[in-house]
Amino acid sequence: MRPELSDYEHISAGKVREIYEIDAEHLLMVVTDRISAYDFVLDTDIPDKGRVLTAMSAYFFEQIDFPNHLAGPLDDERIPEEVLGRAMVCRKLDMVPFECVARGYLTGSGLKEYEATGAVCGVKLPEGLVEASKLDEPIFTPATKAEIGDHDENVGFDVVVKDLGEDLAERLRTATLEIYSQAAKMAEEKGLILADTKFEFGLDKEGNLVLADEVLTPDSSRYWPAEGYEEGKVQPSFDKQFVRNWLTGPKSGWDKNDGSQPPELPGSVVEATRARYVEAYERISGKRFADWIGSCV
């Protein structure tokens, strides 16, 4: 459900976020409680999910040593009360048309590509790697930004160079890996493994690279508990994998390959998913989510 904000013009929508124009220089980014899986936006919301993602992004924007798009505090007077705690005032940027992905461990689409080719996005990897293998060094694996309902497509670094030029492509790769390394160290100190993550960047009027959108949330990242980590096994996670597993399990009755809309999630799955998101925020930040501003809508 899209928030109706009479003071601002709604200019775009994503799977989870709604964007409104404040003025010529600023946007209001509102994070809803929607959840997506397998390129579908589900009919069931996860209560407080938007607030958790906003809280976590705000925490990391403060901690990470890199320019970001925030243009005001989280209780900025320009944020309407009904979206307080799930909205940010952001600078307008010229957004880079690639997802910038850093992988420190092999899993997900990266594992599938490796099993087929021995490489991920053109980066050759050693033989014998398996599910959850730790890579010798984190790798940069960009992807195209897909429209709602389409798949992001992993691409090689050469594609980024061709589209954006060598200088900007190299800046993106360097920034992505540096930020990932900062965040992975922070996660490790909290007993978590940051397996992989994706960033979005934009350019300001001076051509400076700026970290934008969300950062290091359970929607954009794979966090695993360090305790019990074992190479070769699927790791428990603090993201929406729990929802994916239910959708593809026998209880849902849904076939992800037939093009039909996924079924509504049962209450137990909704509650467990919310709990995972909240736990991720609290473990990373050391703060209580109950103290975060705003209320569930």
Swiss-Prot record:
Keyword Nucleotide-binding: yes
One GO BP annotation of this record: 'de novo' IMP biosynthetic process
EC code(s) of this entry: 6.3.2.6
Pfam families for the chain: SAICAR_synt
Catalytic activity: 5-amino-1-(5-phospho-D-ribosyl)imidazole-4-carboxylate + L-aspartate + ATP = (2S)-2-[5-amino-1-(5-phospho-beta-D-ribosyl)imidazole-4-carboxamido]succinate + ADP + phosphate + 2 H(+)
Record keywords: ATP-binding, Ligase, Nucleotide-binding, Purine biosynthesis
Gene Ontology terms, MF aspect: ATP binding; phosphoribosylaminoimidazolesuccinocarboxamide synthase activity
Pathway named in the protein's UniProt entry: Purine metabolism; IMP biosynthesis via de novo pathway; 5-amino-1-(5-phospho-D-ribosyl)imidazole-4-carboxamide from 5-amino-1-(5-phospho-D-ribosyl)imidazole-4-carboxylate: step 1/2
Alphabetical list of InterPro entries matching this protein: SAICAR_synt/ADE2_N, SAICAR_synth, SAICAR_synthetase_CS
Domain of life the protein comes from: Bacteria
GO cellular component, one term: cytoplasm
Family the UniProt entry places it in: Belongs to the SAICAR synthetase family.
Protein name: Phosphoribosylaminoimidazole-succinocarboxamide synthase
Organism: Corynebacterium urealyticum (strain ATCC 43042 / DSM 7109)
Name of the gene encoding the protein in the UniProt record: purC
